[in-house]
Regions:
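Short alpha-helices
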Residues: 70-111, 115-122
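Short Gly/Thr/Asp-enriched flexible loops that form oxyanion-binding sites at enzyme active sites
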Residues: 48-62, 207-213
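Glycine-rich oxoanion-binding loops at beta->alpha junctions
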Residues: 3-34, 182
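Mixed-charge interfacial surface used for oligomerization/domain docking
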Residues: 105-210
Length: 269
């Protein structure tokens, strides 16, 4: 996701762990050109904490930092108490593309941040796994899943989901993924979306295409137009077998930014 029209820097932590505040600060300093730096942060406790610490240090160095929190995972909407709430998943790709295009076009820090927050607020995702992934070096998968069941609401760090259901056809699984997203976003006839059918690591392109075909049919039947789409392994959980679907409300402004030139390994047009 790093390149022309998208990110200036990315900060990977250890596998399934957040980057350290020191790593984030180093990336922030490297990306700073004097106009401020936008942090795009997936909503996980460690990530949020370390990015906030790094932002404080960056501010001390004279760098203006703005944060966009991505929290699109519908499966964790109902979490209460001291938990972080909805997790950040594949909608991060949409946020990064939009804010990257806006920054490349010369938008200031305030405008870029506002666009990113709008995209995050109007994006929802849901994932399903047919088999758990495994941490490198682990002797067994992160959770056990019988062959006649699927796990809904899995995360991108090997986390188990929020519920199990009977194994079903690709069309049935797509139905179960897409309908809660449509309901939560309150979209219907005449609305427009950007859709991502995302592989979790061990799902083939053909399987993802089958899911995406059904997603587009469901949306078309509801009068919802898929203006732009991505199909592929963009935000994975290493070797987990499964997929997620992301919907983002679209309008002319966002589509113009989406269509703006981008040159990264993941996206290029």
């Amino acid at each position: 996701m790093v390149g022309e029209g998208m990110l200036d820097a990315a900060v990977p932590g250890a596998v399934f762990a957040s980057p350290t505040a020191g790593q984030i600060l180093a990336a922030t300093q490297a990306a700073s050109g004097g106009a401020g730096v936008v942090h795009v942060v997936k909503n996980y406790t460690g990530d949020v904490l370390n990015f906030e610490i790094a932002a404080e240090f960056a501010t001390d160095d004279g760098i203006i930092v703005s944060q966009i929190l991505v929290d699109d995972d519908l499966a964790t909407t109902s979490m209460t108490g001291d938990g972080p709430g909805r997790r950040g998943t594949a909608a991060t790709v949409v946020v990064e593309k939009i804010v990257g295009a806006a920054a490349a076009a010369g938008a200031d820090l305030e405008r870029v941040s506002a666009l990113g927050r709008r995209v995050a607020a109007t994006s929802r995702s849901m994932a399903v796994a047919l088999a758990a992934g495994a941490h490198p070096g682990a002797a067994r998968p992160s959770f056990e899943l019988p062959s006649d069941e699927v796990e809904f609401g899995v995360g991108i760090h090997g986390e188990r989901g929020v519920g199990r259901r009977t194994f079903a056809s690709a069309d049935d699984l797509a139905d179960q993924l897409i309908r809660p997203l449509v309901a939560d976003l309150a979209i219907g006839r005449g609305d427009r979306v950007i859709a991502i059918t995302n592989g979790l690591g061990a799902t083939t392109g053909l399987e993802l295409a089958v899911i995406h075909r059904r997603v587009t049919k469901i949306l078309a039947a509801a009068g919802i137009t898929v203006e732009r789409a991505l199909v592929g392994p963009y935000v994975t959980s290493l070797d987990m077998a499964g997929c997620s679907v992301t919907l983002t409300r679209a309008d002319d402004e966002l589509l113009t930014l989406w269509d703006a030139p981008v040159r990264t390994i993941a996206l290029s047009w």
